[in-house]
Amino acid sequence: MRAIIFVLIFAIAFAATREGAILCNLCKDTVKLVENLLTVDGAQAVRQYIDNLCGKASGFLGTLCEKILSFGVDELVKLIENHVDPVVVCEKIHAC
């Protein structure tokens, strides 16, 4: 019985770690995309992009959107404008 419980706990922990890695990678890719969008089209385009994206999002993307919106789009834009590394940005919004 203890072995089964141990295996279940391990499996849950592994799945959570894997999901965390997926969310972190998705966040880093999104930050890079937003960085390019910000450079080309400006902050208003970033706000519009995130609004459109998060309006349709589900799954991991929905989770990431919740974190971004909770953190604040303007704060995200400031970090990106200040050339903060995507990993650090994602850590600040609790996606990594």
Swiss-Prot record:
Domain of life: Eukaryota
GO biological process annotation, one example: defense response to bacterium
SUPFAM superfamilies linked: Saposin
InterPro entries: SapB_2 (IPR008138), Saposin-like (IPR011001), SaposinB_dom (IPR008139)
Keyword tags: Antibiotic, Antimicrobial, Disulfide bond, Signal
One Pfam family here: SapB_2
Gene3D superfamilies with a match to the protein in the record: Saposin-like
Cystine residue pairs: C24-C96, C27-C90, C54-C65
Cleaved signal peptide residues: 1-19
Ranges for domain Saposin B-type: 20-96
Cellular compartment(s): Cytoplasmic granule
Subunit note: Monomer. Homodimer. Hexamer; formed during insertion in the membrane.
Function: Forms pores in the cell membrane of host cells. Has antibacterial activity against M.luteus, no activity against E.coli. Implicated in the cytolytic activity of the parasite.
The protein, known as: Pore-forming peptide amoebapore B
Organism: Entamoeba histolytica (strain ATCC 30459 / HM-1:IMSS / ABRM)
